Amino acid sequence: MNYENVMIDLETMGVNNNAAIIAIGAVAFDFEGNLGPTFYETIELASSVDNGGVMDASTVLWWMKQSDEARKEFERDGLLEYVVLEHFADYLMSFGKDIKFWGNGASFDNVILANAYTRWV
């Protein structure tokens, strides 16, 4: 099946457009309700920060108030940010050139992800 839509969900340590990313999740879908291949990888927080990702105190405090299960994101062995970005690019390229991205508002997930790629160019 040919999927043209990909829903993106980032877990970040900030809310600005250069927020440090700790996970990238995505699922391909169509408007008939079919779900396609998924993607989920965690990023080593220090790697994202070392390469320009910004943390903010209010987001760190928010994460500290979340459930044990939600905070387990920080216990996973994340990969270097550029490695996850390469893996995610490969995932996206598997769908062809005409992909529509969906995220949590036009100014959050999509912008943060685009800025992360820009930092690595």
Question: What is the role of each PLM region?
Answer:
Residues 2-104:
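Conserved non-catalytic scaffold segment of RNase H-like nuclease domains
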